[in-house]
Protein backbone atom coordinates (compact mmCIF):
# COMPACT_ATOMS: atom_id res chain seq x y z
CA UNK A 1 0.00 0.00 0.00
CA UNK A 2 1.41 3.38 -0.91
CA UNK A 3 1.77 5.90 1.87
CA UNK A 4 0.10 8.83 0.15
CA UNK A 5 -3.16 6.91 -0.20
CA UNK A 6 -3.85 7.51 3.48
CA UNK A 7 -2.42 10.96 4.10
CA UNK A 8 -4.00 14.27 4.80
CA UNK A 9 -3.29 17.66 6.36
CA UNK A 10 -4.26 21.35 6.23
CA UNK A 11 -3.79 25.07 5.54
CA UNK A 12 -1.79 26.62 2.71
CA UNK A 13 0.58 29.49 2.11
CA UNK A 14 1.78 30.71 -1.28
CA UNK A 15 2.70 28.86 -4.46
CA UNK A 16 6.09 27.51 -5.48
CA UNK A 17 8.11 28.33 -8.58
CA UNK A 18 8.54 25.44 -11.02
CA UNK A 19 9.57 24.59 -14.51
CA UNK A 20 6.59 23.30 -16.44
CA UNK A 21 6.72 20.02 -18.33
CA UNK A 22 10.46 19.74 -18.80
CA UNK A 23 11.23 17.20 -21.52
CA UNK A 24 13.10 14.15 -20.24
CA UNK A 25 14.10 10.76 -21.49
CA UNK A 26 11.69 8.01 -20.48
CA UNK A 27 12.46 5.75 -17.54
CA UNK A 28 15.23 3.30 -18.36
CA UNK A 29 17.00 2.68 -15.09
CA UNK A 30 16.56 3.36 -11.38
CA UNK A 31 18.90 5.51 -9.33
CA UNK A 32 21.55 3.63 -7.35
CA UNK A 33 19.64 3.06 -4.11
CA UNK A 34 22.44 4.03 -1.77
CA UNK A 35 24.05 0.60 -1.61
CA UNK A 36 27.61 1.74 -0.88
CA UNK A 37 27.39 4.26 1.97
CA UNK A 38 28.41 3.73 5.60
CA UNK A 39 25.32 4.08 7.79
CA UNK A 40 22.53 1.52 7.34
CA UNK A 41 19.30 3.49 6.94
CA UNK A 42 15.76 2.58 5.94
CA UNK A 43 14.67 2.07 2.34
CA UNK A 44 11.60 4.31 2.22
CA UNK A 45 9.07 5.05 -0.49
CA UNK A 46 8.40 8.59 -1.77
CA UNK A 47 5.86 9.23 0.98
CA UNK A 48 3.65 11.27 -1.34
CA UNK A 49 0.95 13.24 0.48
CA UNK A 50 -1.87 15.13 -1.28
CA UNK A 51 -4.19 17.45 0.67
CA UNK A 52 -7.13 19.58 -0.46
CA UNK A 53 -6.48 23.19 0.54
CA UNK A 54 -7.74 26.63 -0.37
CA UNK A 55 -6.63 27.23 -3.92
CA UNK A 56 -6.09 23.65 -5.00
CA UNK A 57 -4.22 20.60 -3.74
CA UNK A 58 -0.96 20.63 -1.78
CA UNK A 59 1.41 17.79 -2.74
CA UNK A 60 4.61 16.88 -0.86
CA UNK A 61 7.13 14.05 -1.22
CA UNK A 62 10.51 12.77 -0.03
CA UNK A 63 13.92 13.30 -1.51
CA UNK A 64 16.13 10.43 -0.36
CA UNK A 65 19.46 11.06 1.30
CA UNK A 66 21.37 8.97 -1.22
CA UNK A 67 20.01 10.91 -4.23
CA UNK A 68 20.55 14.34 -2.67
CA UNK A 69 23.41 16.20 -4.38
CA UNK A 70 24.64 19.43 -2.71
CA UNK A 71 27.45 19.86 -5.25
CA UNK A 72 25.23 19.84 -8.34
CA UNK A 73 21.69 20.30 -6.98
CA UNK A 74 20.31 20.71 -10.49
CA UNK A 75 21.15 17.06 -11.13
CA UNK A 76 17.84 16.02 -9.59
CA UNK A 77 14.32 17.29 -10.16
CA UNK A 78 10.89 15.73 -9.80
CA UNK A 79 8.10 15.17 -12.30
CA UNK A 80 4.66 15.46 -10.74
CA UNK A 81 1.74 13.56 -12.25
CA UNK A 82 -1.97 14.14 -11.68
CA UNK A 83 -4.27 11.30 -12.73
CA UNK A 84 -1.47 9.85 -14.84
CA UNK A 85 -0.67 13.09 -16.70
CA UNK A 86 2.50 15.05 -16.02
CA UNK A 87 1.62 18.53 -14.75
CA UNK A 88 4.94 19.98 -13.56
CA UNK A 89 8.66 19.50 -13.19
CA UNK A 90 9.80 20.75 -9.79
CA UNK A 91 13.47 21.55 -9.31
CA UNK A 92 13.61 23.88 -6.30
CA UNK A 93 11.62 22.03 -3.63
CA UNK A 94 9.81 18.81 -2.80
CA UNK A 95 6.32 20.27 -2.59
CA UNK A 96 3.86 21.85 -5.01
CA UNK A 97 0.49 23.62 -5.10
CA UNK A 98 -1.66 22.24 -7.89
CA UNK A 99 -4.18 25.02 -8.51
CA UNK A 100 -6.19 22.77 -10.82
CA UNK A 101 -6.35 19.82 -8.46
CA UNK A 102 -9.60 18.63 -6.92
CA UNK A 103 -10.63 16.29 -4.15
CA UNK A 104 -10.90 13.54 -6.77
CA UNK A 105 -7.32 13.97 -8.01
CA UNK A 106 -4.57 11.42 -7.43
CA UNK A 107 -0.84 12.13 -7.65
CA UNK A 108 2.43 10.37 -8.23
CA UNK A 109 6.04 11.56 -8.38
CA UNK A 110 9.04 10.45 -10.42
CA UNK A 111 12.55 11.69 -9.74
CA UNK A 112 14.61 12.83 -12.71
CA UNK A 113 18.33 12.23 -12.14
CA UNK A 114 20.87 13.35 -14.74
CA UNK A 115 18.02 13.65 -17.21
CA UNK A 116 16.71 10.13 -16.63
CA UNK A 117 13.21 9.72 -15.23
CA UNK A 118 13.10 7.18 -12.40
CA UNK A 119 10.40 4.80 -11.20
CA UNK A 120 6.91 5.96 -10.27
CA UNK A 121 6.00 6.47 -6.63
CA UNK A 122 2.52 5.01 -6.93
CA UNK A 123 -0.69 7.01 -6.66
CA UNK A 124 -1.69 9.09 -3.65
CA UNK A 125 -5.32 10.10 -3.32
CA UNK A 126 -6.29 13.60 -2.24
CA UNK A 127 -7.60 13.96 1.28
CA UNK A 128 -9.92 16.67 2.56
CA UNK A 129 -9.09 16.47 6.26
CA UNK A 130 -6.27 18.20 8.05
CA UNK A 131 -4.81 14.96 9.36
CA UNK A 132 -4.56 11.23 8.97
CA UNK A 133 -6.81 9.41 11.45
CA UNK A 134 -5.79 5.93 12.60
CA UNK A 135 -8.51 4.10 14.60
CA UNK A 136 -7.23 2.18 17.61
CA UNK A 137 -8.18 -1.04 19.38
CA UNK A 138 -8.61 0.17 22.96
CA UNK A 139 -7.58 -2.56 25.44
CA UNK A 140 -10.22 -3.81 27.87
CA UNK A 141 -10.29 -2.52 31.44
CA UNK A 142 -8.68 -4.57 34.20
CA UNK A 143 -8.35 -5.01 37.97
CA UNK A 144 -5.13 -5.46 39.97
CA UNK A 145 -4.83 -8.37 42.45
CA UNK A 146 -6.01 -8.14 46.03
CA UNK A 147 -4.01 -8.15 49.27
CA UNK A 148 -1.28 -8.86 50.16
CA UNK A 149 0.24 -8.60 46.66
CA UNK A 150 -1.22 -5.18 45.91
CA UNK A 151 -1.89 -2.19 48.14
CA UNK A 152 -4.32 -0.64 47.38
CA UNK A 153 -5.89 -3.99 46.48
CA UNK A 154 -8.26 -4.81 43.60
CA UNK A 155 -7.80 -1.47 41.87
CA UNK A 156 -9.67 -1.04 38.60
CA UNK A 157 -7.96 0.58 35.62
CA UNK A 158 -8.49 1.49 31.99
CA UNK A 159 -5.91 2.33 29.32
CA UNK A 160 -4.56 5.50 27.71
CA UNK A 161 -2.44 5.88 24.60
CA UNK A 162 1.09 6.82 25.59
CA UNK A 163 4.36 7.19 23.66
CA UNK A 164 4.94 5.88 20.16
CA UNK A 165 7.73 5.14 17.72
CA UNK A 166 7.97 4.20 14.04
CA UNK A 167 9.74 1.73 11.81
CA UNK A 168 9.12 -0.12 8.57
CA UNK A 169 7.92 -3.33 10.17
CA UNK A 170 6.98 -5.18 6.99
CA UNK A 171 9.51 -3.85 4.47
CA UNK A 172 7.08 -2.01 2.19
CA UNK A 173 8.83 1.36 2.45
CA UNK A 174 6.11 2.84 4.64
CA UNK A 175 6.39 3.53 8.35
CA UNK A 176 4.26 1.61 10.81
CA UNK A 177 3.52 2.94 14.30
CA UNK A 178 4.40 1.03 17.47
CA UNK A 179 2.28 2.40 20.29
CA UNK A 180 2.52 1.93 24.03
CA UNK A 181 -0.67 1.58 26.06
CA UNK A 182 -0.27 2.55 29.71
CA UNK A 183 -2.87 1.68 32.36
CA UNK A 184 -4.27 4.70 34.15
CA UNK A 185 -2.74 3.40 37.39
CA UNK A 186 0.80 3.71 35.98
CA UNK A 187 3.20 4.85 38.71
CA UNK A 188 6.31 6.92 39.02
CA UNK A 189 9.33 5.09 40.42
CA UNK A 190 8.89 6.67 43.83
CA UNK A 191 5.23 5.59 44.09
CA UNK A 192 4.22 2.24 45.52
CA UNK A 193 1.31 0.18 44.26
CA UNK A 194 0.55 -2.34 41.55
CA UNK A 195 -0.15 -1.37 37.96
CA UNK A 196 -1.94 -2.91 35.04
CA UNK A 197 0.08 -4.56 32.28
CA UNK A 198 1.89 -2.47 29.67
CA UNK A 199 0.89 -3.25 26.07
CA UNK A 200 2.59 -2.54 22.74
CA UNK A 201 0.50 -2.35 19.56
CA UNK A 202 1.62 -2.08 15.93
CA UNK A 203 -0.54 -0.25 13.36
CA UNK A 204 -0.21 0.39 9.67
CA UNK A 205 -1.06 3.87 8.46
CA UNK A 206 -4.31 2.55 6.99
CA UNK A 207 -5.41 1.60 10.50
CA UNK A 208 -4.76 -2.13 10.27
CA UNK A 209 -3.55 -3.51 13.59
CA UNK A 210 -0.68 -5.95 13.09
CA UNK A 211 -0.23 -7.30 16.60
CA UNK A 212 -0.28 -6.66 20.35
CA UNK A 213 2.50 -7.56 22.82
CA UNK A 214 1.54 -7.90 26.50
CA UNK A 215 4.57 -7.24 28.72
CA UNK A 216 2.92 -9.01 31.67
CA UNK A 217 2.65 -8.50 35.42
CA UNK A 218 6.41 -8.31 36.05
CA UNK A 219 6.95 -5.14 34.00
CA UNK A 220 5.68 -2.16 35.97
CA UNK A 221 3.86 0.66 34.15
CA UNK A 222 5.33 4.16 34.30
CA UNK A 223 7.33 6.67 32.29
CA UNK A 224 10.72 5.30 33.35
CA UNK A 225 10.12 1.56 33.02
CA UNK A 226 9.35 0.55 29.42
CA UNK A 227 11.69 2.00 26.79
CA UNK A 228 11.20 0.22 23.47
CA UNK A 229 13.16 0.51 20.24
CA UNK A 230 11.92 0.15 16.67
CA UNK A 231 14.52 -0.20 13.91
CA UNK A 232 15.89 -2.69 11.39
CA UNK A 233 18.81 -3.93 13.47
CA UNK A 234 19.80 -6.90 11.29
CA UNK A 235 19.42 -5.23 7.90
CA UNK A 236 16.84 -7.63 6.46
CA UNK A 237 14.49 -4.81 5.46
CA UNK A 238 12.00 -5.33 8.32
CA UNK A 239 12.25 -3.37 11.56
CA UNK A 240 12.37 -5.25 14.85
CA UNK A 241 10.97 -4.18 18.22
CA UNK A 242 13.29 -4.50 21.22
CA UNK A 243 12.18 -4.04 24.82
CA UNK A 244 12.84 -5.20 28.38
CA UNK A 245 10.63 -8.18 29.24
CA UNK A 246 10.09 -10.64 32.10
CA UNK A 247 8.24 -13.84 32.94
CA UNK A 248 4.62 -13.31 31.94
CA UNK A 249 5.35 -11.41 28.72
CA UNK A 250 3.41 -12.67 25.70
CA UNK A 251 4.50 -11.88 22.17
CA UNK A 252 2.42 -10.62 19.26
CA UNK A 253 1.12 -14.12 18.55
CA UNK A 254 -0.09 -14.54 22.16
CA UNK A 255 2.73 -16.96 23.01
CA UNK A 256 4.73 -16.84 26.26
CA UNK A 257 8.46 -16.17 25.92
CA UNK A 258 10.28 -19.41 25.18
CA UNK A 259 13.81 -18.74 23.88
CA UNK A 260 17.11 -18.25 25.71
CA UNK A 261 16.72 -18.09 29.51
CA UNK A 262 12.94 -17.84 29.14
CA UNK A 263 12.91 -21.43 27.92
CA UNK A 264 13.83 -22.71 31.39
CA UNK A 265 12.32 -20.05 33.69
CA UNK A 266 8.81 -20.41 35.08
CA UNK A 267 6.77 -17.93 33.03
CA UNK A 268 3.78 -17.99 35.40
CA UNK A 269 5.36 -16.51 38.56
CA UNK A 270 4.21 -13.08 39.81
CA UNK A 271 7.29 -11.40 41.29
CA UNK A 272 5.62 -8.22 42.51
CA UNK A 273 6.89 -7.20 45.93
CA UNK A 274 4.91 -7.27 49.16
CA UNK A 275 6.84 -4.28 50.57
CA UNK A 276 10.05 -6.01 51.66
CA UNK A 277 11.64 -2.56 51.25
CA UNK A 278 10.00 0.69 52.47
CA UNK A 279 7.22 1.93 50.14
CA UNK A 280 7.82 -0.74 47.49
CA UNK A 281 4.50 -2.58 47.34
CA UNK A 282 3.97 -3.55 43.71
CA UNK A 283 7.62 -3.11 42.77
CA UNK A 284 9.40 -5.98 40.99
CA UNK A 285 12.57 -6.52 43.04
CA UNK A 286 13.32 -10.17 42.26
CA UNK A 287 12.95 -12.59 39.40
CA UNK A 288 14.40 -12.86 35.90
CA UNK A 289 14.85 -9.81 33.68
CA UNK A 290 15.11 -10.18 29.91
CA UNK A 291 15.84 -8.28 26.74
CA UNK A 292 13.69 -9.54 23.87
CA UNK A 293 13.72 -8.95 20.12
CA UNK A 294 10.33 -9.24 18.40
CA UNK A 295 9.66 -9.62 14.67
CA UNK A 296 8.24 -6.53 13.01
CA UNK A 297 5.59 -8.15 10.79
CA UNK A 298 4.12 -10.48 13.44
CA UNK A 299 5.35 -9.40 16.87
CA UNK A 300 6.64 -12.94 17.40
CA UNK A 301 9.56 -13.50 19.76
CA UNK A 302 12.84 -13.84 17.86
CA UNK A 303 15.34 -13.98 20.73
CA UNK A 304 15.52 -13.41 24.47
CA UNK A 305 18.62 -12.83 26.62
CA UNK A 306 19.22 -11.96 30.25
CA UNK A 307 18.93 -8.19 30.64
CA UNK A 308 22.18 -6.38 31.28
CA UNK A 309 22.82 -4.36 33.40
CA UNK A 310 21.05 -6.58 35.99
CA UNK A 311 19.34 -5.14 39.05
CA UNK A 312 21.59 -6.82 41.61
CA UNK A 313 21.15 -5.29 45.05
CA UNK A 314 18.24 -2.81 44.83
CA UNK A 315 20.06 -0.60 47.35
CA UNK A 316 23.22 -0.39 45.20
CA UNK A 317 21.85 2.34 42.92
CA UNK A 318 22.14 5.30 45.30
CA UNK A 319 18.78 5.24 47.07
CA UNK A 320 17.00 3.03 49.60
CA UNK A 321 13.61 2.41 47.97
CA UNK A 322 14.62 0.86 44.61
CA UNK A 323 13.42 3.86 42.60
CA UNK A 324 16.73 4.63 40.85
CA UNK A 325 17.31 0.97 40.07
CA UNK A 326 14.37 1.07 37.67
CA UNK A 327 15.22 4.23 35.73
CA UNK A 328 15.70 3.02 32.14
CA UNK A 329 16.68 4.65 28.86
CA UNK A 330 17.12 3.23 25.37
CA UNK A 331 18.23 4.27 21.91
CA UNK A 332 19.36 2.78 18.65
CA UNK A 333 22.86 3.88 17.67
CA UNK A 334 25.74 3.37 15.27
CA UNK A 335 28.45 2.51 17.80
CA UNK A 336 31.80 0.72 17.64
CA UNK A 337 30.72 -2.86 17.07
CA UNK A 338 33.68 -4.64 15.45
CA UNK A 339 35.71 -5.60 18.49
CA UNK A 340 38.66 -3.78 20.05
CA UNK A 341 39.15 -0.13 19.21
CA UNK A 342 36.78 2.38 17.71
CA UNK A 343 35.78 0.36 14.66
CA UNK A 344 32.24 0.61 13.37
CA UNK A 345 30.39 -1.29 10.67
CA UNK A 346 27.75 1.38 10.17
CA UNK A 347 25.10 -1.12 11.25
CA UNK A 348 22.77 -0.14 14.10
CA UNK A 349 23.07 -1.45 17.64
CA UNK A 350 20.75 -1.56 20.64
CA UNK A 351 21.66 0.56 23.67
CA UNK A 352 19.90 0.00 26.99
CA UNK A 353 20.67 2.15 30.04
CA UNK A 354 19.81 1.67 33.69
CA UNK A 355 20.20 3.84 36.77
CA UNK A 356 20.78 7.52 37.54
CA UNK A 357 21.50 9.95 38.95
CA UNK A 358 24.13 8.35 41.24
CA UNK A 359 25.04 5.17 39.34
CA UNK A 360 24.34 4.70 35.65
CA UNK A 361 25.09 1.88 33.24
CA UNK A 362 24.75 1.43 29.47
CA UNK A 363 24.96 -1.86 27.57
CA UNK A 364 25.29 -2.14 23.79
CA UNK A 365 23.83 -5.13 21.96
CA UNK A 366 23.75 -6.41 18.38
CA UNK A 367 20.95 -8.30 16.67
CA UNK A 368 22.74 -9.93 13.74
CA UNK A 369 22.20 -13.19 11.83
CA UNK A 370 19.61 -14.42 14.32
CA UNK A 371 21.87 -13.84 17.34
CA UNK A 372 21.37 -11.33 20.17
CA UNK A 373 24.78 -10.55 21.67
CA UNK A 374 26.19 -7.93 24.03
CA UNK A 375 29.20 -6.04 22.62
CA UNK A 376 30.20 -3.71 25.47
CA UNK A 377 29.05 -2.18 28.75
CA UNK A 378 29.75 1.18 30.36
CA UNK A 379 29.33 1.81 34.08
CA UNK A 380 29.55 5.13 35.89
CA UNK A 381 30.00 4.05 39.49
CA UNK A 382 30.20 6.50 42.38
CA UNK A 383 34.02 6.59 42.30
CA UNK A 384 34.26 7.74 38.67
CA UNK A 385 34.02 11.27 37.18
CA UNK A 386 30.99 10.11 35.17
CA UNK A 387 28.86 9.34 38.22
CA UNK A 388 25.88 11.66 38.57
CA UNK A 389 26.40 13.21 35.13
CA UNK A 390 23.49 11.57 33.28
CA UNK A 391 20.02 12.69 32.35
CA UNK A 392 16.49 11.39 31.90
CA UNK A 393 17.29 11.00 28.21
CA UNK A 394 20.30 10.25 26.03
CA UNK A 395 21.12 11.21 22.46
CA UNK A 396 23.31 9.74 19.73
CA UNK A 397 25.69 11.87 17.65
CA UNK A 398 28.94 11.28 15.77
CA UNK A 399 30.84 14.01 17.60
CA UNK A 400 34.24 13.38 15.97
CA UNK A 401 33.22 12.38 12.45
CA UNK A 402 34.76 8.90 12.55
CA UNK A 403 31.65 7.02 11.43
CA UNK A 404 30.66 5.84 14.90
CA UNK A 405 28.20 7.66 17.13
CA UNK A 406 28.93 8.68 20.69
CA UNK A 407 26.32 8.68 23.46
CA UNK A 408 25.54 12.06 24.99
CA UNK A 409 24.30 11.08 28.42
CA UNK A 410 23.58 14.33 30.19
CA UNK A 411 26.74 16.22 31.11
CA UNK A 412 28.91 13.37 29.82
CA UNK A 413 29.87 12.13 26.38
CA UNK A 414 30.47 8.37 26.26
CA UNK A 415 32.72 7.00 23.52
CA UNK A 416 31.27 4.78 20.81
CA UNK A 417 33.21 1.86 22.32
CA UNK A 418 31.69 2.24 25.80
CA UNK A 419 34.51 4.17 27.46
CA UNK A 420 34.24 7.63 28.96
CA UNK A 421 35.19 10.49 26.64
CA UNK A 422 34.56 13.70 28.63
CA UNK A 423 32.27 15.41 31.11
CA UNK A 424 31.56 18.96 32.22
CA UNK A 425 31.01 17.80 35.78
CA UNK A 426 27.85 19.92 36.01
CA UNK A 427 25.71 16.96 36.98
CA UNK A 428 22.31 15.55 36.27
CA UNK A 429 19.43 17.04 34.30
CA UNK A 430 15.98 16.36 32.94
CA UNK A 431 16.28 17.84 29.42
CA UNK A 432 18.92 17.45 26.70
CA UNK A 433 19.40 18.93 23.22
CA UNK A 434 22.24 17.84 20.91
CA UNK A 435 22.82 19.33 17.46
CA UNK A 436 24.61 22.01 15.47
CA UNK A 437 23.42 24.75 17.81
CA UNK A 438 26.21 27.18 16.85
CA UNK A 439 26.74 26.95 13.07
CA UNK A 440 29.65 29.42 13.18
CA UNK A 441 31.53 26.96 15.41
CA UNK A 442 32.85 23.59 14.18
CA UNK A 443 31.25 20.43 15.49
CA UNK A 444 28.15 19.78 17.56
CA UNK A 445 26.97 21.30 20.82
CA UNK A 446 24.93 20.18 23.81
CA UNK A 447 22.44 22.33 25.70
CA UNK A 448 21.36 21.07 29.09
CA UNK A 449 19.51 22.52 32.09
CA UNK A 450 20.71 21.18 35.43
CA UNK A 451 19.03 20.05 38.62
CA UNK A 452 22.10 20.34 40.88
CA UNK A 453 22.04 23.56 42.90
CA UNK A 454 25.85 23.49 43.22
CA UNK A 455 26.44 24.26 39.54
CA UNK A 456 25.11 26.46 36.74
CA UNK A 457 21.41 26.23 35.97
CA UNK A 458 22.26 25.47 32.33
CA UNK A 459 25.20 25.19 29.98
CA UNK A 460 26.13 24.93 26.31
CA UNK A 461 29.17 22.74 25.71
CA UNK A 462 31.11 21.07 22.92
CA UNK A 463 29.75 17.56 22.36
CA UNK A 464 33.21 16.16 21.59
CA UNK A 465 35.42 17.79 24.23
CA UNK A 466 32.86 18.99 26.82
CA UNK A 467 34.45 22.45 26.61
CA UNK A 468 31.92 24.90 28.06
CA UNK A 469 30.84 27.54 25.55
CA UNK A 470 28.28 29.30 27.75
CA UNK A 471 26.72 28.70 31.14
CA UNK A 472 24.13 30.21 33.41
CA UNK A 473 24.46 31.45 36.97
CA UNK A 474 24.51 29.28 40.08
CA UNK A 475 21.11 29.64 41.74
CA UNK A 476 19.36 28.00 44.65
CA UNK A 477 16.53 27.01 42.30
CA UNK A 478 17.25 24.30 39.73
CA UNK A 479 16.23 24.18 36.07
CA UNK A 480 13.95 21.24 35.34
CA UNK A 481 12.99 22.13 31.78
CA UNK A 482 14.79 23.71 28.87
CA UNK A 483 14.80 23.98 25.08
CA UNK A 484 17.42 24.90 22.48
CA UNK A 485 17.14 25.32 18.71
CA UNK A 486 17.11 27.99 16.01
CA UNK A 487 13.54 29.21 16.50
CA UNK A 488 14.02 32.88 15.55
CA UNK A 489 15.72 34.53 12.54
CA UNK A 490 16.65 37.52 14.71
CA UNK A 491 19.70 35.88 16.27
CA UNK A 492 22.55 33.74 14.95
CA UNK A 493 22.31 30.04 15.64
CA UNK A 494 20.15 28.47 18.31
CA UNK A 495 18.23 30.22 21.02
CA UNK A 496 17.91 28.51 24.42
CA UNK A 497 15.87 28.95 27.56
CA UNK A 498 15.02 27.21 30.82
CA UNK A 499 12.49 27.57 33.60
CA UNK A 500 14.74 30.05 35.42
CA UNK A 501 17.00 31.53 32.72
CA UNK A 502 15.24 34.89 32.95
CA UNK A 503 14.33 34.80 29.26
CA UNK A 504 15.88 33.57 26.04
CA UNK A 505 19.66 33.39 25.61
CA UNK A 506 21.88 33.03 22.56
CA UNK A 507 23.58 29.64 22.47
CA UNK A 508 26.38 31.29 20.51
CA UNK A 509 27.27 34.01 23.03
CA UNK A 510 25.42 33.05 26.19
CA UNK A 511 23.97 36.56 26.29
CA UNK A 512 20.35 37.23 27.21
CA UNK A 513 18.71 38.31 23.94
CA UNK A 514 15.04 38.46 24.96
CA UNK A 515 14.08 39.01 28.58
CA UNK A 516 10.35 39.33 27.86
CA UNK A 517 9.80 36.15 25.87
CA UNK A 518 8.07 33.22 27.54
CA UNK A 519 8.10 30.43 24.94
CA UNK A 520 6.91 26.95 25.80
CA UNK A 521 9.48 24.49 27.13
CA UNK A 522 8.55 21.23 25.52
CA UNK A 523 8.90 19.92 21.96
CA UNK A 524 10.12 21.35 18.67
CA UNK A 525 8.87 20.78 15.12
CA UNK A 526 9.79 22.00 11.63
CA UNK A 527 6.41 23.15 10.39
CA UNK A 528 5.94 26.26 8.26
CA UNK A 529 7.62 27.71 5.15
CA UNK A 530 10.76 29.15 6.75
CA UNK A 531 13.77 27.35 8.23
CA UNK A 532 13.18 28.41 11.85
CA UNK A 533 11.84 25.61 14.01
CA UNK A 534 8.45 25.89 15.69
CA UNK A 535 7.31 24.97 19.21
CA UNK A 536 5.04 22.04 20.06
CA UNK A 537 3.37 21.98 23.47
CA UNK A 538 0.26 20.12 24.58
CA UNK A 539 -1.81 19.82 21.42
CA UNK A 540 -0.68 22.94 19.57
CA UNK A 541 2.12 24.17 17.30
CA UNK A 542 3.16 27.83 17.58
CA UNK A 543 5.82 30.19 16.32
CA UNK A 544 8.43 31.53 18.72
CA UNK A 545 6.38 34.75 18.97
CA UNK A 546 3.29 32.80 20.04
CA UNK A 547 1.46 32.77 16.70
CA UNK A 548 -0.75 29.68 16.60
CA UNK A 549 -0.13 27.50 13.53
CA UNK A 550 -1.97 24.28 14.39
CA UNK A 551 -4.01 22.86 17.22
CA UNK A 552 -6.23 19.88 17.85
CA UNK A 553 -9.05 20.67 20.25
CA UNK A 554 -10.23 17.06 20.08
CA UNK A 555 -6.83 15.68 21.09
CA UNK A 556 -4.99 15.09 24.35
CA UNK A 557 -1.30 15.12 25.22
CA UNK A 558 0.64 12.48 27.14
CA UNK A 559 2.60 12.14 30.38
CA UNK A 560 0.74 14.55 32.64
CA UNK A 561 2.36 17.94 33.09
CA UNK A 562 5.00 17.06 30.49
CA UNK A 563 2.19 17.38 27.91
CA UNK A 564 4.13 15.58 25.17
CA UNK A 565 2.86 14.24 21.83
CA UNK A 566 2.83 10.58 20.90
CA UNK A 567 5.68 11.36 18.47
CA UNK A 568 7.15 14.07 16.27
CA UNK A 569 9.24 13.07 13.24
CA UNK A 570 9.56 13.45 9.48
CA UNK A 571 7.14 10.63 8.67
CA UNK A 572 6.15 11.47 5.07
CA UNK A 573 5.90 14.32 2.59
CA UNK A 574 8.86 16.69 2.38
CA UNK A 575 11.59 17.16 5.00
CA UNK A 576 9.37 18.90 7.54
CA UNK A 577 7.96 17.05 10.51
CA UNK A 578 4.63 15.53 11.43
CA UNK A 579 3.02 15.49 14.89
CA UNK A 580 1.10 12.52 16.26
CA UNK A 581 -1.49 13.26 18.94
CA UNK A 582 -4.08 10.95 20.47
CA UNK A 583 -7.75 11.79 20.39
CA UNK A 584 -9.39 12.46 23.74
CA UNK A 585 -10.90 9.12 24.67
CA UNK A 586 -8.13 7.18 22.86
CA UNK A 587 -10.31 6.08 19.94
CA UNK A 588 -7.71 7.10 17.36
CA UNK A 589 -4.39 8.72 16.59
CA UNK A 590 -4.18 11.82 14.43
CA UNK A 591 -1.09 12.57 12.36
CA UNK A 592 -0.92 16.24 11.40
CA UNK A 593 1.31 17.49 8.60
CA UNK A 594 2.08 20.93 7.22
CA UNK A 595 0.74 22.18 3.89
CA UNK A 596 2.67 25.45 3.82
CA UNK A 597 4.63 25.70 0.58
CA UNK A 598 8.38 26.05 1.15
CA UNK A 599 11.22 26.63 -1.30
CA UNK A 600 13.77 25.08 1.05
CA UNK A 601 14.72 21.71 -0.43
CA UNK A 602 16.27 19.09 1.87
CA UNK A 603 16.45 15.33 1.89
CA UNK A 604 14.18 13.51 4.32
CA UNK A 605 15.45 14.03 7.86
CA UNK A 606 14.98 10.31 8.48
CA UNK A 607 18.04 9.75 6.26
CA UNK A 608 20.20 11.82 8.60
CA UNK A 609 21.70 9.16 10.94
CA UNK A 610 21.77 11.48 13.96
CA UNK A 611 18.17 12.60 13.56
CA UNK A 612 16.92 9.06 12.95
CA UNK A 613 18.65 7.66 16.02
CA UNK A 614 17.32 10.51 18.16
CA UNK A 615 13.82 9.72 16.86
CA UNK A 616 14.32 6.14 18.08
CA UNK A 617 14.95 7.49 21.60
CA UNK A 618 12.23 10.14 21.54
CA UNK A 619 9.74 8.02 23.48
CA UNK A 620 12.14 7.16 26.32
CA UNK A 621 12.43 8.74 29.76
CA UNK A 622 11.64 12.44 29.73
CA UNK A 623 10.77 12.68 26.04
CA UNK A 624 12.98 15.03 24.02
CA UNK A 625 12.67 16.20 20.39
CA UNK A 626 15.18 14.98 17.78
CA UNK A 627 17.86 17.22 16.23
CA UNK A 628 19.62 16.72 12.87
CA UNK A 629 23.41 16.71 12.58
CA UNK A 630 23.37 19.96 10.59
CA UNK A 631 22.02 23.42 11.25
CA UNK A 632 18.61 24.38 9.86
CA UNK A 633 17.87 28.10 10.06
CA UNK A 634 18.04 31.42 8.26
CA UNK A 635 21.14 31.64 6.09
CA UNK A 636 21.91 27.95 6.49
CA UNK A 637 24.41 26.22 4.25
CA UNK A 638 23.35 23.17 2.29
CA UNK A 639 24.09 20.13 4.46
CA UNK A 640 26.61 17.55 3.25
CA UNK A 641 25.39 14.43 1.50
CA UNK A 642 24.71 11.77 4.14
CA UNK A 643 27.01 8.74 3.98
CA UNK A 644 24.25 6.14 4.01
CA UNK A 645 23.15 2.89 2.45
CA UNK A 646 19.72 1.29 2.30
CA UNK A 647 18.41 -2.17 1.45
Label the model's feature ranges.
Residues 51-55, 90, 344:
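Short, ordered beta-strand-loop transition motifs
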Residues 15-34:
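Bacterial Sec-dependent N-terminal signal peptides
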Amino acid sequence: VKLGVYLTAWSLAAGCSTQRLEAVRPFDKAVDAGSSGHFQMEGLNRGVVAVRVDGGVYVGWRMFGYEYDPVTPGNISFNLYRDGRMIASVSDSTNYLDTEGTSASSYSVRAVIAGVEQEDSGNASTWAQKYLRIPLDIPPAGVTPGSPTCDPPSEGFTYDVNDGSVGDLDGDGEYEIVLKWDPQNARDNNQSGCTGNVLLDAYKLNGKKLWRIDLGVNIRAGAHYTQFLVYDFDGDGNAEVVVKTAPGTRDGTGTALHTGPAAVDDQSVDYRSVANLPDTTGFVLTGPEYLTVFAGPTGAELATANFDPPRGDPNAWGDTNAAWMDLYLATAGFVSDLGAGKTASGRPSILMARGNPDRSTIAAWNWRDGQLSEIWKFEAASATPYAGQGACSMAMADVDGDGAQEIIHGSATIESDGTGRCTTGFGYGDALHVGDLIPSRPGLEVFMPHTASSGPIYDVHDASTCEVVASGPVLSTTARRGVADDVSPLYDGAEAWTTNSGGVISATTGALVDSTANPSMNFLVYWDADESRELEDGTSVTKYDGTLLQECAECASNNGSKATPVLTADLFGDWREEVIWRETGNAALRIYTTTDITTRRLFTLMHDPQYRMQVSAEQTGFNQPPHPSFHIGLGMADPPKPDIRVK
